[in-house]
Amino acid sequence: MKEYRVYLERARSRQQDFLYPLIFREYIYGLAYSHNFNRSIFVENGGYDNKYTLLNVKRLITRMYQQNHLIISANDSNKNPFLGYNKNFYSQIISEGFAIVVEIPFFLQLSSSLEEAEIIKSYKNVRSIHSVFPFLEDKFTYLNYVSDIRIPYPIHLEILVQILRYWVKDVPFFHLLRWFLYHFXNWNCFIPTKKSISTFSKSNPRLFLFLYNFYVCEYESIFLFLRNKSYHLRLKSFSVFFERNFFYAKREHLVEVFSKDFSYTLPFFKDPNIHYVRYQGKCILASKNVPFLMNKWKYYFIHLWQCFFDVWSQPRTININQLSEHSFQLLGYFSNVRLNRSVVRSQMLQNTFLIEIVSKKLDIIVPIIPLIRSLAKAKFCNVLGHPISKPVWADSSDFDIIXRFLRICRNLSHYYNGSSKKKSLYRIKYILRLSCIKTLACKHKSTVRAFLKRSGSEELLEEFFTEEEEILSLIFPRDSFTLHRFHRNRIWYLDILFSNDLVNDE
């Protein structure tokens, strides 16, 4: 992002902080395609395309403003016979420009804010994905109740555009963004459907992720602000909200609506034992307190979404469960707190009595059924978990095929080595190993047995099972590291930067 700062500062001197002129800068599209937007292990980075040039962008934006609205609608086919251009191609070009331009000022605001000690201190509880796993081990054994929350959607993008206007003051840019969303992303309907959101996310992934993450960030900032500053709303720290219209009005309405459901008024409260974790479109709210307070937080979320973001959310979408009786899914794991009961014989003078001791242990389990479903979707096995060949990769060399399977197996192995029981993980490794062998046999037009006997690839494929033990034997001393400990202990790898494609498939 350093080059973003250089280019934007150059544009600032000429255009006075306006984003609209950046749409016509060709280097914006060069920067957009110089980064790897898709982290999928199956998709290669295509690089910068010459079709995304400044001249084409100018022509397309001019054509957008000059087209006849009586002829074109959002439900037209991708190729309009009157204007003779492909709407999907047009949408992709402008979408990349929007995404990269909107990200620049927010990155600069974040980098400038982090230079101030007060801002850093206020965000000291913000952590990366690496801190989630130690948090589960250290904190969850002391908590009693957990609320499984799915962030509501679809949200109309008009609301997102209005929220963006509080942060960026550029009327022409948002006029163009709104026009684009309504006429080329099928957002003409009053209530967007999940199908339209899915189509928009696939055709414009970077812009969709930015808008969605911005919506989540906005909702979390308001939620944390209300939680931390509930008794002293008008503080200096409120300046981070800039000029958010009707914030106090909606906040008062939120309290008013909430107080009608109870015989007495209970204002916003602080719960020192509450913990909040979010990943993708799901969040976990855990607390040590009684279910009554968790139920309070449940309705706070619902009214916040309905009153501030105009998103309808049903109370049944938020479940409150006891940790010792129910498991919850987060980051591709099934987690629960198990109660271990043990009896200890105690003797005092001549009296002997039994004492029952209850201890809590966190169980983190690999979700074998969703993983097999994901592998079946990726054509590594069938729905029953039986390995099959992947003929799509048969055109590659043997080394590339084995390297691809090993990379997938290594990523899944690193991700799920924090589980308490690894039998399910070994089953996934077995599916990938046999699928790799069948793919190689299919390429050489032979059976699995004949291929292994002829090529002697059996030793090479043992890497699917021996790699983890060899690495850990180099890290830990021989006397302390045993295979039994490796099977039982949870090991979190710090190279987990993102969830794999085969994780959290629903």
Curated annotation (Swiss-Prot):
Where is it localised? Plastid, Chloroplast
Establish whether keyword Translocase is in the entry: no
Report the GO terms under cellular component.
Answer: chloroplast
UniProt keyword annotation of Kinase present: no
Q: What keywords does the record list, in alphabetical order?
A: Chloroplast, mRNA processing, Plastid, RNA-binding, tRNA processing
Its main subcellular localisation, reduced to a broad class, is: plastid
GO molecular function: any one?
Answer: RNA binding
An example GO biological process term is: mRNA processing
Please report a single Pfam family linked to this protein: Intron_maturas2
Similarity-based family: Belongs to the intron maturase 2 family. MatK subfamily.
Function text: Usually encoded in the trnK tRNA gene intron. Probably assists in splicing its own and other chloroplast group II introns.
- What is the name listed in the Swiss-Prot or TrEMBL entry for this protein? Maturase K
| Organism phylogeny | Eukaryota, Viridiplantae, Streptophyta, Embryophyta, Tracheophyta
- The encoding gene is matK
